[in-house]
Amino acid sequence: MNALKYFSNHLITTKKQKKINVEVTKNQDLLGPSKEVSNKYTSHSENDCVSEVDQQYDHSSSHLKESDQNQERKNSVPKKPKALRSILIEKIASILWALLLFLPYYLIIKPLMSLWFVFTFPLSVIERRVKHTDKRNRGSNASENELPVSSSNINDSSEKTNPKNCNLNTIPEAVEDDLNASDEIILQRDNVKGSLLRAQSVKSRPRSYSKSELSLSNHSSSNTVFGTKRMGRFLFPKKLIPKSVLNTQKKKKLVIDLDETLIHSASRSTTHSNSSQGHLVEVKFGLSGIRTLYFIHKRPYCDLFLTKVSKWYDLIIFTASMKEYADPVIDWLESSFPSSFSKRYYRSDCVLRDGVGYIKDLSIVKDSEENGKGSSSSLDDVIIIDNSPVSYAMNVDNAIQVEGWISDPTDTDLLNLLPFLEAMRYSTDVRNILALKHGEKAFNIN
């Protein structure tokens, strides 16, 4: 509005000035001689008009400045006081809510969370370890499952058979050792060396088997691959694979020496530091009628050894001593374990060689069995334990040599033999294993 007033006043003054100029020109025409007077008058009037215009301009500019200042003041004052009130209320409410939650959060929730973490941390560590072991076991099982579990038999080169017609024989799981009910046992023949046949897997089930199912139908192959998913793949010679793992009705024969192997004896006349602590046995020799007292000492772990092996083998005593001396000692040994010796062989059953001594011929053991039961005279299931190599010189491949024992209380030879004898009871021919003590000679083929 002030600007409009300024422009209107300015226009009005200019119009007035034009009218004055027109009148002055008319007066000059009318009043020629008085030209100077009129000029003075016009100049005077012009100056007055200019001064008025300047005053009006200054007044309008000052008025505009005042209006601008008033407008700025109005803008500085908030238009909506209600919005400010709502903002203040929200801030106050948030502050009050934070104050209300401060004590419960830092005094109840935070301590409970820290206690929960402390109690559950060991459980979480155990859980992670279990998961890690499970993953590792799964990976190992997967790698084992990728291995082909099959068995191959090599027949004579003259036979020509079709691999598709090969019969697959399976062996059920063993109750002991590392054959479990969850293992798959696969035994497969392969007529061509190096060829791969598709193995037939039979899941082992814990059920009762007949003798015909437990025994292998064919044992003519020279070597066989036998294994389980957990055991892997192993190459065994033919005669090391048992005819039936569970068929333990027919026990092998374990022939044991007496003196220096199971016991040590000393006559009463000899001076020995421990002679008075041994078991006293009176021996009467029939021919001369002389009675002699002997102090008998058992080898360490003798009773435990006889108790264990009596469950696995038929025990036989074979000694180079006289019958009159051996029988009282054997009777005393039999009173120390639940079983007994099935046979007793003495010096009269040995073979005497000049310059060598008494030799124990194991064929007498098989001959007595053959006469009683009509079985073969092979020594594939006979083991002899002796401390003298001369005693088993005729059957070296059937022998297990132990150190001769006299009085060492820390001796553990009998105890160390138990795991080996437990495994040997499953072998088809004990000579294939015991002959390995000869080294490379055991692999020489005539």
UniProtKB/Swiss-Prot annotation:
Subcellular location: Endoplasmic reticulum membrane; Nucleus membrane
Top-level taxon of origin: Eukaryota
One Gene Ontology molecular-function label: protein serine/threonine phosphatase activity
Positions with biased composition (Basic and acidic residues): 56-75
Residue ranges of the TM segments: 87-103
Broad enzyme group: hydrolase
BP terms from Gene Ontology: lipid droplet formation; negative regulation of phospholipid biosynthetic process; nuclear envelope organization; positive regulation of lipid biosynthetic process; regulation of phospholipid biosynthetic process
Compositional bias (Polar residues): 139-156
Family: Belongs to the Dullard family.
Assembly mode: Component of the NEM1-SPO7 complex.
Protein name as annotated: Nuclear envelope morphology protein 1
Gene behind the chain: NEM1
